[in-house]
A protein has these predicted regions:
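Acyl-donor binding region in acyl/amide transferases
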Residues: 11, 22-26, 31, 35, ...
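A short, conserved structural fragment
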Residues: 71-79, 261
Length: 315
C-alpha cells in the first residue's frame, strides 16, 4: 500500500523536522519494525541527536511524534506489544511517609520557605514519590516529557516536608487556554514548550497552615523559571493547572492571582482524536510569567535547548 506524500516539515515539541528527516523516520520504521516502537524511537533519537540538555534521549517525545505521523498515514508502526504487568509503577511505602504531628499557624510564621528541586535517584526523590503515592488522591505516576519536582521545607521545621509539587509539559490541547492565547495550531505546536503544567500539588494532611498553599505558589512563580532554565535551557512564559472541580474550588490558585479560564471539555490530557473520553471536566487556571504573554506565545520561536550541564532527567 502506497503511503501519502510527506509534508515539507513538521514541528513538534519545539523542534522542526525537515522532509528528509521525516523520510528517515519512515525508512527506520519500515526497516526495524520487528524491534517495536520503543526501539525505533530510541534509534531515531540517536540518529537525529534528539536529546535533553542532560544528554538523555527524548525517547518518549520521539515515540509520540511517530504515533502522530502514523495516525496521519505518513508511516507505519508495529503493533504495541505489552511487556510485563500493565499499570502504574508501584511505590514501596515506608515510615518516612507516615503521618506526623500536626503543624498549625499562618504561612508567615514558617517563612522563609525552601523549595528544593528533587533530582535523580536521591533520598529526596524516593521521599517525594512515597508522599505523593500515599497522600495525593491521584497517587504517583511516571511523568512524561519535561518535568521538575519540588519538596517544600521551612527553616522553622528543619527537614520536615510541608508540601510536594510537580511541574510537567503542558497539555497538548485545552480549548479554554487556547482561546485565551488566541494562537493557531502551528503557533501552538511551536510554542507549547513555553507553558508548564502544575500536575501535582500536595499539602501534607497534617499540615494545617493558613495561607500556605497560595504562598508556595507565589514562591514557585518566582523560582521555577530559573530552575527550568537551568535544567532545560529556556525560560517558560506561562504556568497552567487543571483542578478537579468535584473535589476542589481552586481557592489557593485564586488567592495566588492565577487566572480562571473555565473548564476542560472532558477529554484526555493529550487528546488527539477530538472527542470526549470520559475524563472528568477540570477547572483551568493560568499564571503569566511575563507581560503580554499571549502575544509572546503567539510570536515565540521554538526554544533553544542549552547544552549546559543539567540535573539528570528522571522521567
Amino acid at each position: 500500500m502506497n503511503q501519502p506524500e510527506l509534508p515539507e516539515s513538521v514541528t513538534f515539541c519545539g523542534r522542526r523536522f525537515s522532509r528528509s528527516e521525516l523520510e528517515l523516520m519512515r525508512q527506520i520504521a519500515d526497516q526495524f519494525a520487528g524491534l517495536g516502537r520503543t526501539e525505533i524511537a530510541r534509534t531515531l533519537c540517536e540518529l537525529l541527536e534528539w536529546k535533553r540538555p542532560s544528554g538523555g534521549l527524548k525517547n518518549y517525545e520521539c515515540r509520540q511524534l511517530l504515533e502522530r505521523l502514523a495516525e496521519q498515514g505518513w508511516l507505519r508502526l508495529p503493533e504495541v506489544r505489552p511487556l510485563g504487568p500493565r499499570g502504574p509503577r508501584r511505590v514501596r511505602l515506608s515510615a518516612a511517609s507516615a503521618e506526623q504531628p500536626e503543624l498549625t499557624g499562618t504561612a508567615g510564621q514558617y517563612e522563609p520557605l525552601r523549595l528544593i528541586v528533587v533530582a535523580g535517584a536521591s533520598a529526596d526523590s524516593r521521599l517525594w514519590m512515597e508522599l505523593i503515592e500515599r497522600h495525593h488522591y491521584l497517587g504517583y505516576r511516571v511523568p512524561v516529557g519535561a518535568q521538575l519536582r519540588y519538596l517544600v521545607r521551612s527553616q522553622r521545621t528543619g527537614e520536615r516536608v510541608l508540601a510536594c509539587l510537580q511541574w510537567t509539559s503542558a497539555a497538548w490541547k485545552m480549548a479554554a487556554r487556547d482561546r485565551w492565547i488566541g494562537w493557531t495550531h502551528e503557533q501552538r505546536a511551536r510554542s507549547l514548550p513555553y507553558i508548564v503544567n502544575n500536575s501535582r500539588f500536595l499539602i501534607l494532611p497534617w499540615v494545617r497552615i493558613q495561607g500556605l498553599a497560595s504562598k508556595i505558589l507565589a514562591h514557585c512563580a518566582r523560582q521555577l523559571p530559573e530552575d527550568w532554565q537551568r535544567r532545560y535551557g529556556y525560560r517558560p512564559l506561562l504556568l497552567e493547572t487543571l483542578v478537579d472541580g468535584q473535589r476542589f474550588a481552586g481557592t489557593c490558585y485564586r488567592a495566588a492571582n492565577w487566572i480562571p479560564l473555565g473548564q476542560t471539555q472532558g477529554r484526555g490530557r493529550m487528546d488527539r482524536y477530538h472527542q470526549a473520553d470520559g475524563s472528568a471536566r477540570k477547572l483551568v487556571f493560568v499564571y503569566p510569567l511575563c507581560r503580554h504573554v499571549q502575544q509572546r506565545l503567539r510570536e515565540a520561536q521554538p526554544p533553544c535547548f542549552s547544552e549546559a550541564e543539567a540535573d539528570t532527567d528522571w522521567a
